[in-house]
Amino acid sequence: MIRAGVVLFGADGIAVIERIRDGLTYYVLPGGQVDPGETLAEAARRETYEELGLHVRIHGAVAVVNFRETTQHYFLAEAIGGEFGTGAGPEMDSPVDSERGSYRALWLPPHRYGELKPKPIGATLAAVPDPEAVVTGWLAAPLGFDEV
């Protein structure tokens, strides 16, 4: 499966989806499956609107993460419209006790970047003084990670 998502910084941190499933709470970058006929960037824009309620400009690829049978492509994005937290994709109405668990858009503050999944991206951003500058640097040479 191929997925596309975004790294989106704001005044309060990085945009994430808080997932609560099977009693666990975790934070993932916005994104989802690439639909037939979509480019990776188109899928990243669509998923960002569905999950966050924001229209974004894609600045370029910053990371590719291989996880199990999935390749996840992440793009640096900039919000250009919409209202954060108004995403209306089908998953956004999923209750905590459902098989899929719940989804909620929020800004993860910098001191919590280490909790972010994919873990290689979260760990890298947590370890540097200027995460946004580091991610911008990845535009020149997107990182590749295998997450276990």
Regions found by a protein language model. Name each.
Residues 1-15, 33-36:
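Conserved N-terminal beta-strand and adjoining loop/helix that marks the start
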Residues 3-5, 70-74, 102-105:
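Short hydrophobic/aromatic beta-strand or adjacent loop that forms the aromatic wall/cage
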Residues 8, 76-78, 106-109:
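Short, well-ordered beta-strand micro-motif
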Residues 11-13, 21-23, 67-69:
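Short strand-connecting beta-turns/loops that link adjacent beta-strands
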Residues 24-27, 85-148:
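Nudix hydrolase/Nudix homology domain
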Residues 29-61:
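The catalytic Nudix box helix
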Residues 34, 79, 110-113:
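Hydrophobic pocket-lining residues within nucleotide cofactor-binding pockets
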Residues 53-93:
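Active-site segment of metal-dependent pyrophosphate-handling enzymes
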